[in-house]
């Protein structure tokens, strides 16, 4: 939990007790420091085979919070280090066990491409993340939340493919539709079924 906030559902504290030295069996960890996140991921990878899914919520705050902690520094070095730290966590996940699904949740932002077209992309800090790394390019699957007003109120979905105005992507036959229910369990189950 990068943003160090309560989870948005009833009973989360009992379902996800805090992971720390006193409780190594915990299932909830809060940190916005990339090397601490890496330590936690490595611990789960090596010592917690019963954990099959990790959700890193509000991942962009690893970048935003480091930027704010270093706001008084001048020059481009801090942006390089922020980008390198974010890149390192994502790259480390690629080397983890195959039965482990790691979900990075991030906010999106609307930018404009060279032709003036609107593009929705993952929110990042600094041009290096956008122009050199291109964060979404590091993932096989990128889903975007879609919110529409329906007959029963607000309806939440995931967009699974690029519609020309976002960087969403997934193997074309994985989800069977461009729009799917906003349900992480459904997503995890579908990915597992597709990969096996």
What are these regions (language model features)?
Residues 1-54, 61:
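Conserved P-loop
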Residues 12-15, 99, 139:
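A generic structural signal for alpha->beta connector loops
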Residues 41, 90, 188-191:
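A generic alpha-helix structural signal
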Residues 43, 62-65, 96, 138, ...:
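Conserved, well-folded catalytic cores of nucleic-acid-processing
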Residues 53-134:
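P-loop NTPase motor core
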Residues 102-181:
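Phosphate-binding/switch region of NTP-binding enzymes
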Residues 179-196:
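Charged phosphate-binding loop/patch that engages nucleotide di/tri-phosphates or the phosphate backbone
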């Amino acid at each position: 939990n990068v943003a160090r906030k309560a989870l948005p559902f009833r009973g989360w504290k009992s379902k996800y007790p805090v992971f720390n030295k006193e409780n190594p069996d915990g299932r909830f960890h809060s940190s916005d420091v990339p090397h601490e996140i890496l330590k936690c991921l490595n611990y789960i990878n090596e010592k917690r085979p019963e954990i099959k899914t990790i959700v890193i919520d509000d991942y962009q705050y690893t970048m935003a919070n480091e930027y704010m902690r270093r706001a008084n520094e001048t020059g481009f070095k801090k942006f390089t280090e922020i980008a390198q730290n974010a890149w390192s966590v994502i790259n480390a996940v690629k080397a983890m066990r195959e039965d482990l699904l790691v979900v990075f949740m991030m906010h999106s932002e609307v930018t404009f491409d060279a032709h003036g077209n609107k593009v929705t992309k993952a929110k990042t800090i600094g041009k290096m993340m956008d122009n050199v790394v291109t964060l979404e390019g590091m993932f096989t699957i990128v889903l975007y939340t879609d919110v529409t007003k329906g007959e029963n109120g607000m309806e939440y979905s995931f967009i699974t493919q690029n519609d020309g105005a976002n960087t969403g992507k997934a193997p074309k036959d994985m989800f069977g539709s461009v729009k799917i229910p906003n349900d992480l369990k459904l997503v995890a189950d579908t990915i597992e079924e597709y990969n096996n």
